[in-house]
Amino acid sequence: QRLMNIEGYSVGKEVVILGSGDIGLIMARRMTLEGANVKVVAELMPYSGGLKRNIVQCLNDFNIPLKLSHTVVGIDGEKRITGVTIAEVDANRQPIPGTEVHYDCDTLLLSCGLIPENELTREIGVEMNRVTSGPNVDDKLQTGVEGVFACGNVLHVHDLVDHVSAEAALAG
């Protein structure tokens, strides 16, 4: 997102996306609108992690196929990607031999989850939560360092800005 939205770069013309959370879905649409050919969105899980409306507006409206229970099993290329192979996975998320499909592409976009950026939080000695990768907070969202509050994606990754706004109001 940063390369396209802030830096203004076109990252590729023939794209495969791994991960179907909202960011992956929105990037599929954005890259299509920027002139790229998004060949497929592959998702390891048997369901998409994105909102239904994003599946419709970002994939279905642009005829981008979504392959559930699939993952990347091969990447071709030397200095630049020239192709990606995906395969269906079983209930244990292991590739099923014989289900491989190769896509010629110059870009593999990984949208496999977000981790809160907390370098500053760690530097001031805030205790971190191993589950969320965000800081531990009390019921008012104050960390263990007096006067330091945490909310939004620094606390844990949110899908909707409405939740971030509610946390911000609580934290003051």
Task: Report residues per predicted region.
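Residues forming the flavin
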Residues: 1-172
